[in-house]
Amino acid sequence: MAKPAKRVAVTGAAGQIAYSLLFRIANGDLLGKDQPVILQLLDLPQAQAAVKGVVMELDDCAFPLLAGVVITDDPKVAFKDADVALLVGARPRSKGMERKDLLSANAEIFTVQGAALNEVASRDVKVLVVGNPANTNAYIAMKSAPDLPKKNFTAMLRLDHNRALSQLAAKSGKPVASIEKLAVWGNHSPTMYPDFRFATAEGESLLKLINDDVWNRDTFIPTVGKRGAAIIEARGLSSAASAANAAIDHVRDWVLGTNGKWVTMGIPSDGSYGIPEDIIYGVPVICENGEYKRVEGLEIDAFSREKMDGTLAELLEERDGVAHLLK
């Protein structure tokens, strides 16, 4: 007996990240190889023709799991009964644009989208914000959706997590799949803190294996933090395929579980680890039965506290920068 289709809303559907994302969702990579999906695609009126072109390509793949596609420029149509909402579209920073201008331009988008989710989405909708500044955009959407549980709103730090895994595998010579218990704390920005103090590879402590504080401080942390900028420098375009891959990882793990393994998600704080409530902050989590649970009780040393407070300061500044736009 075929499962009933799940509705997956994707914003910024004509964009580069969505182009890497939609075909994988339709192929079953997001919700499982036995789960039919209906894609509900949102983009601006001027992008509708481009979205139609992407849908022509989706049709031409003849994906067995793709049960339907909706194309719209209306958030209330896109989010209607959505089980998953991937908020990929955001206002990019243009030349000469101040960060506060970027924040307010995005606040406008995410208040509208949060309100639409509040009105029409499934009450169990799983929301992942990919569009930057992702943590604060997720915070704005959450605050604009008072009837939905706060825990439904998350921001993507999985790209930072995967970038850190790759750097650790290269440094230690261990297979990337063998590395467990990595944490990435804070904002999806160069201030975030990738933390491998608890990490193991094939049961061995990575900290002991690598045993190089200078590398951690001067190479590892900045490399992960500035990787997005390095890709733009090399490619002339921002990371799209790796961002789409991280979005798939994030939602798949949230829905299908992590088998006891740690992953990083930006989630609303409950006050633990000294992070004020409701701030959307990257923490290590374990997922099971469609829920995430933060890893509790980790020891925070002085260096880590400084790094975690630094990225928190940026998030508080962003929050305060949009406070007047939230009723």
Curated annotation (Swiss-Prot):
Residues at which NAD(+) binds: G12, A13, A14, G15, Q16, I17, A18, N106, Q113, V130, G131, N132
Keyword tags: NAD, Oxidoreductase, Tricarboxylic acid cycle
GO biological process annotation, one example: malate metabolic process
Gene Ontology terms, MF aspect: L-malate dehydrogenase (NAD+) activity
Catalytic residue list: H188
Keyword NAD: yes
Catalytic activity reported: (S)-malate + NAD(+) = oxaloacetate + NADH + H(+)
EC number(s) stated in the UniProt entry for this protein: 1.1.1.37
Residues annotated to bind substrate: R93, R99, N132, R163
Keyword field contains Oxidoreductase: yes
Pfam families with a match to the protein in the record: Ldh_1_C, Ldh_1_N
Domain of life: Bacteria
PANTHER family in UniProt: MALATE DEHYDROGENASE (PTHR23382)
Function: Catalyzes the reversible oxidation of malate to oxaloacetate.
Family: Belongs to the LDH/MDH superfamily. MDH type 2 family.
Record-given protein name: Malate dehydrogenase
